[in-house]
Regions:
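C-terminal helix-rich "cap/oligomerization" subdomain common to oxidoreductases
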Residues: 3-13, 174-210
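Rossmann-like dinucleotide-binding domain that binds NAD(P)(H)
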Residues: 80-143, 185-192
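Generic hydrophobic alpha-helical segments
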Residues: 22, 170-171, 197
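Glycine-centered short loops/turns at secondary-structure junctions
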Residues: 29, 56, 204-205
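Beta-loop-alpha module in the N-terminal Rossmann-like domain of NAD(P)-dependent dehydrogenases
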Residues: 1-49
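C-terminal substrate-binding/catalytic lobe of Rossmann-fold NAD(P)-dependent oxidoreductases
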Residues: 121-171
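A contiguous active-site-proximal alpha/beta segment in oxidoreductase catalytic domains
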Residues: 32-33, 38-97
Length: 210
Protein backbone atom coordinates (compact mmCIF):
# COMPACT_ATOMS: atom_id res chain seq x y z
CA UNK A 1 0.00 0.00 0.00
CA UNK A 2 2.87 2.40 0.70
CA UNK A 3 3.82 2.57 -2.99
CA UNK A 4 0.23 2.93 -4.23
CA UNK A 5 -1.45 6.17 -5.23
CA UNK A 6 -4.92 4.64 -4.94
CA UNK A 7 -6.44 1.37 -3.80
CA UNK A 8 -9.24 -0.88 -5.07
CA UNK A 9 -10.83 -3.49 -2.80
CA UNK A 10 -12.38 -6.41 -4.70
CA UNK A 11 -14.67 -9.14 -3.43
CA UNK A 12 -17.63 -8.69 -5.79
CA UNK A 13 -19.61 -11.84 -4.95
CA UNK A 14 -18.68 -12.00 -1.27
CA UNK A 15 -19.52 -8.58 0.12
CA UNK A 16 -19.49 -9.98 3.65
CA UNK A 17 -15.67 -9.98 3.36
CA UNK A 18 -15.41 -6.26 2.62
CA UNK A 19 -15.46 -5.15 6.24
CA UNK A 20 -12.38 -7.24 7.00
CA UNK A 21 -10.63 -6.45 3.71
CA UNK A 22 -11.20 -2.70 4.08
CA UNK A 23 -9.67 -2.19 7.50
CA UNK A 24 -6.11 -1.46 6.35
CA UNK A 25 -6.88 0.34 3.06
CA UNK A 26 -9.50 2.59 4.64
CA UNK A 27 -7.05 3.54 7.37
CA UNK A 28 -4.32 4.45 4.88
CA UNK A 29 -5.44 7.95 3.92
CA UNK A 30 -5.13 7.01 0.24
CA UNK A 31 -8.18 7.18 -2.05
CA UNK A 32 -10.01 3.85 -2.07
CA UNK A 33 -12.71 2.34 -4.25
CA UNK A 34 -14.64 -0.61 -2.81
CA UNK A 35 -16.20 -2.77 -5.51
CA UNK A 36 -19.90 -3.53 -5.45
CA UNK A 37 -21.71 -4.89 -3.49
CA UNK A 38 -20.34 -2.60 -0.76
CA UNK A 39 -21.71 -4.42 2.31
CA UNK A 40 -24.18 -7.16 3.24
CA UNK A 41 -26.30 -4.85 5.39
CA UNK A 42 -26.74 -1.32 6.68
CA UNK A 43 -24.85 -1.85 9.95
CA UNK A 44 -21.79 -3.23 8.20
CA UNK A 45 -21.84 -0.38 5.67
CA UNK A 46 -21.83 2.17 8.48
CA UNK A 47 -18.92 0.44 10.22
CA UNK A 48 -16.83 0.37 7.04
CA UNK A 49 -17.41 4.05 6.33
CA UNK A 50 -16.67 4.89 9.97
CA UNK A 51 -13.14 3.51 9.54
CA UNK A 52 -12.57 5.72 6.48
CA UNK A 53 -14.04 8.80 8.09
CA UNK A 54 -11.96 8.35 11.25
CA UNK A 55 -8.74 8.31 9.22
CA UNK A 56 -9.78 10.88 6.62
CA UNK A 57 -9.54 8.32 3.82
CA UNK A 58 -11.52 9.25 0.68
CA UNK A 59 -13.60 6.27 -0.43
CA UNK A 60 -16.72 5.24 -2.30
CA UNK A 61 -18.53 2.32 -3.89
CA UNK A 62 -21.00 1.88 -6.72
CA UNK A 63 -22.36 -0.37 -9.42
CA UNK A 64 -20.92 0.62 -12.78
CA UNK A 65 -24.52 0.80 -14.05
CA UNK A 66 -24.82 4.17 -12.30
CA UNK A 67 -22.67 5.58 -15.12
CA UNK A 68 -24.86 4.40 -18.01
CA UNK A 69 -25.49 7.25 -20.46
CA UNK A 70 -29.18 6.40 -20.65
CA UNK A 71 -29.83 7.61 -17.10
CA UNK A 72 -28.27 11.02 -17.76
CA UNK A 73 -31.30 12.10 -19.80
CA UNK A 74 -33.62 11.73 -16.80
CA UNK A 75 -34.39 14.66 -14.49
CA UNK A 76 -34.68 13.09 -11.01
CA UNK A 77 -36.80 16.00 -9.75
CA UNK A 78 -39.58 14.95 -12.14
CA UNK A 79 -39.58 11.20 -11.47
CA UNK A 80 -42.91 9.88 -10.16
CA UNK A 81 -42.38 6.10 -10.28
CA UNK A 82 -39.94 3.56 -11.71
CA UNK A 83 -40.30 -0.05 -12.84
CA UNK A 84 -36.91 -1.73 -13.21
CA UNK A 85 -36.01 -5.21 -14.39
CA UNK A 86 -32.86 -7.24 -14.93
CA UNK A 87 -31.25 -10.64 -14.23
CA UNK A 88 -32.30 -12.91 -11.36
CA UNK A 89 -30.23 -13.78 -8.26
CA UNK A 90 -31.07 -10.89 -5.98
CA UNK A 91 -28.01 -11.31 -3.77
CA UNK A 92 -25.52 -10.71 -6.60
CA UNK A 93 -27.35 -8.76 -9.30
CA UNK A 94 -29.89 -6.59 -7.46
CA UNK A 95 -27.27 -3.92 -6.76
CA UNK A 96 -27.19 -3.10 -10.48
CA UNK A 97 -30.87 -2.17 -10.34
CA UNK A 98 -30.99 -0.64 -6.86
CA UNK A 99 -28.06 1.72 -7.46
CA UNK A 100 -29.49 3.62 -10.47
CA UNK A 101 -33.01 3.41 -9.04
CA UNK A 102 -31.95 5.16 -5.83
CA UNK A 103 -29.92 7.69 -7.83
CA UNK A 104 -33.04 8.64 -9.79
CA UNK A 105 -35.62 8.48 -6.99
CA UNK A 106 -33.52 10.59 -4.60
CA UNK A 107 -35.61 9.64 -1.57
CA UNK A 108 -35.16 7.27 1.33
CA UNK A 109 -36.94 3.91 1.01
CA UNK A 110 -39.37 3.22 3.83
CA UNK A 111 -40.60 -0.35 3.31
CA UNK A 112 -40.56 -3.18 0.75
CA UNK A 113 -42.75 -6.13 -0.21
CA UNK A 114 -41.77 -9.09 -2.39
CA UNK A 115 -43.50 -11.68 -4.55
CA UNK A 116 -41.56 -14.52 -6.12
CA UNK A 117 -41.48 -17.85 -7.91
CA UNK A 118 -38.49 -20.09 -8.59
CA UNK A 119 -37.85 -18.19 -11.82
CA UNK A 120 -38.81 -14.61 -10.97
CA UNK A 121 -39.12 -12.04 -8.22
CA UNK A 122 -40.82 -8.68 -7.84
CA UNK A 123 -39.85 -6.19 -5.15
CA UNK A 124 -42.14 -3.23 -4.49
CA UNK A 125 -40.49 -0.27 -2.76
CA UNK A 126 -42.36 2.50 -0.97
CA UNK A 127 -40.41 5.70 -0.31
CA UNK A 128 -40.85 8.13 2.56
CA UNK A 129 -42.26 10.79 0.22
CA UNK A 130 -45.05 8.42 -0.88
CA UNK A 131 -43.64 7.50 -4.28
CA UNK A 132 -43.15 3.86 -5.28
CA UNK A 133 -40.84 1.81 -7.46
CA UNK A 134 -40.43 -1.85 -8.35
CA UNK A 135 -37.52 -4.16 -9.16
CA UNK A 136 -37.87 -7.49 -10.98
CA UNK A 137 -35.38 -10.27 -11.69
CA UNK A 138 -35.74 -13.04 -14.27
CA UNK A 139 -34.14 -16.49 -14.10
CA UNK A 140 -33.22 -16.74 -17.78
CA UNK A 141 -31.71 -13.28 -17.88
CA UNK A 142 -32.91 -9.85 -18.88
CA UNK A 143 -31.37 -6.64 -20.16
CA UNK A 144 -31.27 -3.80 -17.67
CA UNK A 145 -34.45 -1.87 -18.47
CA UNK A 146 -36.41 0.87 -16.70
CA UNK A 147 -39.85 2.28 -17.37
CA UNK A 148 -39.73 5.71 -15.76
CA UNK A 149 -42.95 7.61 -15.16
CA UNK A 150 -42.31 11.33 -14.76
CA UNK A 151 -44.38 14.48 -14.51
CA UNK A 152 -43.95 14.96 -18.26
CA UNK A 153 -44.52 11.41 -19.54
CA UNK A 154 -43.19 7.87 -19.60
CA UNK A 155 -39.72 6.83 -20.76
CA UNK A 156 -38.47 3.28 -21.36
CA UNK A 157 -34.70 2.94 -21.09
CA UNK A 158 -32.63 -0.11 -22.01
CA UNK A 159 -28.98 0.15 -21.04
CA UNK A 160 -26.88 -0.33 -24.17
CA UNK A 161 -24.15 2.26 -23.65
CA UNK A 162 -20.59 1.43 -22.61
CA UNK A 163 -21.27 2.18 -18.95
CA UNK A 164 -18.14 0.40 -17.73
CA UNK A 165 -15.92 2.72 -19.76
CA UNK A 166 -17.69 5.72 -18.25
CA UNK A 167 -17.31 4.18 -14.80
CA UNK A 168 -13.54 3.79 -15.31
CA UNK A 169 -13.30 7.44 -16.31
CA UNK A 170 -15.15 8.34 -13.10
CA UNK A 171 -12.85 6.10 -11.08
CA UNK A 172 -9.71 7.71 -12.53
CA UNK A 173 -11.16 11.15 -11.83
CA UNK A 174 -11.77 10.12 -8.21
CA UNK A 175 -8.16 8.99 -7.79
CA UNK A 176 -7.02 12.34 -9.15
CA UNK A 177 -9.35 14.59 -7.16
CA UNK A 178 -10.04 12.40 -4.10
CA UNK A 179 -13.67 13.53 -4.29
CA UNK A 180 -16.14 10.64 -4.06
CA UNK A 181 -18.91 10.86 -6.69
CA UNK A 182 -21.40 9.01 -4.46
CA UNK A 183 -22.14 10.25 -0.91
CA UNK A 184 -21.60 7.74 1.88
CA UNK A 185 -25.14 8.20 3.16
CA UNK A 186 -26.57 7.24 -0.24
CA UNK A 187 -24.54 4.03 -0.33
CA UNK A 188 -25.66 3.19 3.22
CA UNK A 189 -29.30 3.72 2.17
CA UNK A 190 -28.81 1.41 -0.82
CA UNK A 191 -27.35 -1.30 1.42
CA UNK A 192 -30.29 -0.88 3.82
CA UNK A 193 -32.71 -1.32 0.91
CA UNK A 194 -30.88 -4.40 -0.33
CA UNK A 195 -30.92 -5.87 3.18
CA UNK A 196 -34.67 -5.27 3.50
CA UNK A 197 -35.22 -6.74 0.03
CA UNK A 198 -33.47 -9.95 1.01
CA UNK A 199 -35.65 -10.21 4.12
CA UNK A 200 -38.80 -9.50 2.10
CA UNK A 201 -38.01 -12.36 -0.27
CA UNK A 202 -38.22 -14.75 2.69
CA UNK A 203 -41.72 -13.53 3.65
CA UNK A 204 -43.55 -12.90 0.34
CA UNK A 205 -46.61 -10.67 0.55
CA UNK A 206 -45.54 -8.95 3.77
CA UNK A 207 -44.19 -5.44 4.20
CA UNK A 208 -40.67 -5.24 5.61
CA UNK A 209 -39.38 -1.95 6.98
CA UNK A 210 -36.10 -0.61 5.62
Amino acid sequence: MKKSDGLIILSPDNCELHEQLCRLPLSSGKPCYVDKTFAPDEASAKRVFAVAEASGTPCWSTSALRFAEEYAQIDPSKVVAINSWGPNDFEIYAIHQLEPLMMLMQSRPQRVMALKTDAWYLLTIEFEDGRCASVSGYEHGSPFVMNINSKTGSTVLEVKSDFFHRFILGLVQFFRTKRAPVPHEETVAIMALREAGQKALTVPGQWVNV
